[in-house]
Every structure is written in C-alpha cells, then in structure tokens.
Amino acid sequence: MAESMTRAAPADNGALATSLRQMIAVLERERQALAALDADDLICAARDKEGLCDAIAAIGAQALDNQTRSLAETAHQLNEVNRRVRNLLAANVAARLEALGGQRGTNRVTYTPARA
C-alpha cells in the first residue's frame, strides 16, 4: 500500500506543478489586464483562476514538495500584488465617482434653483 502512495505522489506533484505554473501565467495575465483596465480579460482571468483553484484543491496540499511549494508561494505573492493593484484601482474609481457625483447623503446644490 505504501508503494502505491509513493508512486502516486510524483504524478500528483507533476499535475500540481503544471497547475501552479498555469496559475502563475493566469495571474500575470490578470496583472496585465488590471494595468490595461481590460474588463473582458479580467473576467476571463477570474474564470481561469477559479478553475485552476478547483484543480489544485482536488490534488491537495499533501502533494507539496520543495518545487511545488516554491511555485505556490510565487502564485500567492502574485495574487497579493494583484489584490493590492485592484484595491488601488477600485479606490481611484470610487474617488473619481465621488468627485463627479458628490458624496452620498450630502445636499447637492448643483441643480437647485438660484435663490432670489
């Protein structure tokens, strides 16, 4: 029984390494889409990330070796960078919308009639 588990681990590591490399490529594509403000590519990247997360979860963390652990850490770091970029972009958009439309809950005097 231990032999079958030993044989399964390299195949799992190979599949995991492949999935992690694909995830890194998707995260790099996501970063480019964020920089270009390309909503269509962001949606595609999100869909691809979700599928890869499912594939990686099916393999499980027990298949991690030094190589796959390093790939997983790289993917995590790229995802964190993308999260920060997304948050900055969202804050920028929110600030611009607020500047254009005013804060919610404040009296808008832009279109009020002039006082005589």
What residue ranges belong to the model's regions?
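Extended, charge-rich alpha-helical scaffolding segments
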Residues: M1-E73, Q77
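Short terminal interaction segments
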Residues: A2-T6, T68-A116
